[in-house]
């Protein structure tokens, strides 16, 4: 369509909408540029332009906003929501913060959170989790708090030192390693919240049945189901079912990307559920709940490491909710099952085999070559796929030339399964 004649453009668009009557309009930059331009043109040329299917309502306009998330500043452009049909702008999607926008993910978010699809496609997963909590509270007859901020209870310096801590991180053993298994806890923090009944109204409360937070000794009542724990339970159960279904399909199967989009949406909701417990704008959380989750997470990882050592495994690195283990002659999934079963028995949490590496390289810290970088490694799975974390190609501020060059080098290394032959490939790179 030609933009030079605005009146003709508007008439052509009206005819297209009347002829095809679409249920969904997909755009790129539709919120921030296209629809504002069309509405301004319609006003300037006095053309009755209504992209909505509902003749009585043209559109709903939401102002642009700026917000911070995990140290990065994001701009959300103004939004144009239609009536009677959806408008989805894949360039104005908060879903794009963690993974590429997917309509299937937006629909899954809307289905789980009971938020309309146009809003779910644009809002952060944190807003979706808040909607889930509000819905759960209303079903249980719980009043919605008017004030978001909850005052933190006083702690002495010793109490604060014992309670205030994040996830546990063991530095990796620098170098090239062979036949390593990566074990990941399934949605560790959300699973802890569900298993331990952690919610704003249960942490710090005593009852007939109590569990105590490691280190701090804060009580968690088990007498009643916590709101957050009850909201998370169906979410985690569904994500676990989806992940197990994905294993039945190969990556090139048409069903695989569909299930991946659903799993991604559920993953983000579970991911933000933990951080929201200590967030000032959370209606139902408090900082004690956040501290309890971190403490239990640290204890869980220590238990997993101790279990691995007892069963004769070498732990190369452990990072918050995962650990990389190695054992002589252990290079098949069944070789690691006894370890996983024992960890699940001791912790009460599901742990999964992410994969077995033919070879894996942990890089050294830039400041001290004797110390491993906290989260920078790359390796080749036994099924041929390459896993890369913390390298230049993963950074958003890396230029394409550097990222592509690094990608080609690593792909060349991934062509070799025997780690002893890797040095010979360096000269070719």
Residue ranges: model-predicted function:
Residues 183-218:
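Extended active-site and interfacial segments that coordinate phosphate-rich ligands
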Residues 29-31, 35-41, 192-193, 326-329, ...:
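A short acidic (Asp/Glu
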Residues 2-101:
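Conserved DEDDh/DEDDy metal-dependent 3′-5′ exonuclease domain
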Residues 1, 89, 223-284:
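Active-site cores of enzymes that catalyze phosphoryl transfer or operate on phosphate-rich substrates
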Residues 326-429:
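C-terminal polymerase-core module
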Residues 239, 270, 312-326:
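Catalytic palm active-site di-aspartate
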Residues 84-197, 257-307, 317, 328, ...:
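Common nucleic-acid-contacting/processivity interface regions adjacent to the catalytic cores
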Residues 47-53, 103-108, 197-208:
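Cytochrome P450 catalytic domain signature, combining two hallmark sequence patches
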């Amino acid at each position: 369509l030609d933009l030079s004649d605005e009146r003709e453009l508007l008439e052509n668009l009206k005819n297209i909408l009347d002829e095809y009557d679409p249920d969904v309009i997909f755009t790129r930059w539709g919120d921030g540029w296209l629809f504002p331009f069309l509405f301004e043109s319609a006003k300037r040329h006095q053309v009755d332009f209504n992209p909505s299917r509902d003749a009585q309502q043209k559109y709903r306009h939401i102002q642009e906003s700026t917000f911070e998330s995990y140290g990065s500043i994001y701009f959300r452009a103004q939004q144009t929501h239609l009536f009677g049909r959806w408008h989805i702008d894949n360039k104005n999607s908060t879903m794009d913060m963690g993974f590429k926008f997917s309509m299937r993910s937006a629909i899954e978010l809307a289905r789980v959170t009971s938020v309309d699809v146009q809003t779910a496609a644009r809002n952060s997963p944190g807003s979706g989790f808040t909607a889930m909590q509000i819905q759960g509270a209303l079903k249980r007859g719980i009043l919605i708090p008017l004030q978001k901020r909850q005052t933190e209870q006083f702690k002495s310096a010793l109490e604060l030192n014992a309670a205030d801590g994040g996830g546990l991180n063991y530095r990796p053993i620098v170098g090239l390693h062979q036949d390593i298994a990566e074990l990941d806890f399934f949605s560790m923090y959300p699973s802890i919240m569900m298993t331990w009944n952690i919610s704003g109204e249960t942490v710090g409360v005593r009852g007939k049945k109590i569990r105590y937070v490691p280190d701090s000794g804060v009580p968690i009542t088990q007498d009643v189901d916590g709101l957050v724990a009850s909201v998370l339970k169906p979410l985690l159960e569904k994500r676990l079912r989806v992940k197990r279904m994905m294993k039945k399909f190969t990556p090139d199967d048409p069903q695989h990307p569909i299930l991946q989009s659903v799993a991604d949406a559920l993953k983000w909701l579970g991911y933000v559920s933990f951080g929201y417990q200590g967030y000032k704008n959370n209606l139902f959380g408090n900082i004690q709940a956040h501290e309890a989750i971190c403490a239990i997470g640290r204890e869980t990882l220590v238990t997993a490491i101790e279990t691995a050592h007892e069963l004769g495994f070498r732990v190369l690195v452990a990072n918050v909710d995962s650990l990389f283990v190695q054992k002589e002659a252990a290079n098949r999934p069944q070789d690691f099952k006894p370890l996983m079963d024992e960890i699940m028995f001791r912790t009460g949490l599901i742990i999964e085999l992410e994969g077995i590496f033919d070879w894996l390289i942990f890089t050294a810290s830039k400041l001290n070559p004797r110390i491993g970088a906290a989260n920078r490694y790359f390796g080749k799975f036994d099924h041929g796929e390459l896993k890369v974390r913390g390298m230049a190609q993963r950074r958003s501020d890396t230029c394409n030339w550097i990222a592509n060059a690094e990608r080609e080098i690593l792909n060349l290394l991934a062509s070799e399964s025997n780690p002893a032959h890797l040095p010979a490939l360096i000269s070719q790179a």
